[in-house]
A protein has these predicted regions:
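Acidic, glycine-enriched catalytic cores built around paired aspartates
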Residues: 1-179
Length: 179
């Protein structure tokens, strides 16, 4: 649905803003943080996940308590960040209503597929694991825990088959070509 999400925020002003200093790039990605990414990769590979302790930072002063290392997107370069939903592709002057309709439709469509599978499953718990495994394998290319402003991300995203629809005409043509 990456092309539809981009179309949902298409405007001349947003074309100028996306990928600039104050906004994420026009590439749809999801920042999960290392901890959650490792958990999902473990499920997808069928391996046991070692729930390691959170990393603590050392700040070099004895009087300051240990500070847990933040595993969220500190640069806020991803439309979906950490343990919260923060859709940043939309410009501040725009209404999020169209984008919400599209997002909710995408989620509902996906949940309907999951529900159909679970309703007919003999072993629901095993089917949940299968759904997670298949979903992670099919969509892990959108997970990016790095700096979305770095030029290397644009090249990596292209290798992963992610769109970088920088302009409204690109977004509309990308959707038309995919339809």
């Amino acid at each position: 649905y990456q092309d539809l999400l981009r179309v949902s925020v298409a405007s001349p002003g947003n074309d100028h803003r996306l990928g600039a200093n104050e906004a994420p790039p026009a590439i749809i990605s999801m920042f999960l943080g290392d901890e959650l990414t490792e958990l999902l990769n473990s499920i997808a590979s069928g391996q046991h996940h070692d729930n390691a302790e959170r990393v603590k930072m050392t700040v070099g002063a004895d009087i300051i308590p240990f500070i847990r290392k933040d595993n969220t997107d500190r640069n806020r370069t991803s439309p979906f960040t950490g343990n919260k939903f923060e859709f940043r592709m939309l410009g501040s002057a725009s209404s999020i209503s169209d984008t919400n309709v599209m997002l909710n439709t995408m989620v509902a469509d996906t949940f309907a597929v999951f529900a159909d599978r679970l309703e007919t499953a003999g072993d629901t718990e095993a089917e949940v694991k299968n759904i997670i495994k298949e979903t992670v394998k099919a969509h892990k290319r959108i997970i990016f825990n790095g700096d979305g402003y770095d030029e290397s991300w644009v090249k990596e995203a292209e290798k992963r088959g992610l769109y970088n629809l920088k302009t409204t005409p690109d977004a509309l043509a990308g959707r038309a070509a995919a339809a």
